[in-house]
Amino acid sequence: MKIENIIRRVLRESIQIEELGDGFIEVFIMSGDEVVGDMTLETSDNKHYMVVMATIKEEFKGRGLYKQALLELLRIMPNIIIQSAFRSPEAERAWRSLIKQLPNHIGHRIENILDIEMISIFNK
């Protein structure tokens, strides 16, 4: 197997995406063959996807898998904008860390809407 195919296979294994209908997608966060977390995102326009729920198994927290999953989702779906508004303290730390370490081709925007901080990440 060519190295490019191996790399693509490994990247595909880091997340799996399932369309749930009614504007929702489920992103399964993988470690090898094991589902270690998931995110539910909602869209009304197939462009802006709001994270409405995210979980990671306790033993996998702190490994950056949530941040990796967000970046991988942007790689797979390059024309979307991922948004987060209501974050747990753990998610807040993950988003702050992500913003500090964004690759050069990923942009971000922070807006305050009705006293709620919305963070958006997107491909430039």
Question: Can you say where each PLM-predicted feature lies in the sequence?
Answer:
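Short acidic, low-complexity intrinsically disordered linear motifs used
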Residues: 1-16
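Conserved beta-hairpin
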Residues: 18-38
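GNAT/GCN5-related N-acetyltransferase fold signature
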Residues: 41-42, 56
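Conserved acetyl-CoA binding element of GNAT-fold acetyltransferases
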Residues: 47-58
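Conserved acetyl-CoA-binding loop-helix of GNAT-fold acetyltransferases
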Residues: 56, 62-75
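Conserved GNAT acetyl-CoA-binding A-motif
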Residues: 75-90
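Conserved active-site tyrosine of GNAT-family acetyltransferases
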Residues: 95
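C-terminal "cap" of GNAT-fold acetyltransferases
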Residues: 108-124
